[in-house]
Amino acid sequence: FAAVSVDCSEYPKPDCTLEYRPLCGSDNKTYANKCNFCNAVVESNGTLTLSHFGKC
């Protein structure tokens, strides 16, 4: 069982696309795509992690 992770090293980005590929964060919030999720990770100073791919 491997931990689920996303590489957010190239974030934050000012604009995210409207692409819908949901990710569920450790805050139990569904993020529309990697960009939205990674921006939130950066904002949280790394406290937010990926729970799983798909909607929460």
Swiss-Prot record:
UniProt GO molecular function: serine-type endopeptidase inhibitor activity
Give every Kazal-like domain span. 6-56
For this UniProt record, give its keywords in alphabetical order, as a comma-separated list: Disulfide bond, Glycoprotein, Protease inhibitor, Repeat, Secreted, Serine protease inhibitor
Site entry (Reactive bond 3), positions:
18-19
Give the primary localization class.
secreted
- Superkingdom of this protein's organism: Eukaryota
Q: Where in the cell is it found?
A: Secreted
This entry carries the following GO cellular component terms, namely:
extracellular region
- Keyword Endoplasmic reticulum attributed: no
SMART domains, per the entry = KAZAL (SM00280)
Which Pfam family, any one of them, does this sequence belong to?
Kazal_1
Q: Provide the residues annotated with a glycan attachment (glycosylation).
A: 45
The intrachain disulfides are: 8-38, 16-35, 24-56
Q: What is known of its domains?
A: Avian ovomucoid consists of three homologous, tandem Kazal family inhibitory domains.
Question: What is the name listed in the Swiss-Prot or TrEMBL entry for this protein?
Answer: Ovomucoid
Which organism is this protein's natural source? Answer: Callipepla squamata castanogastris
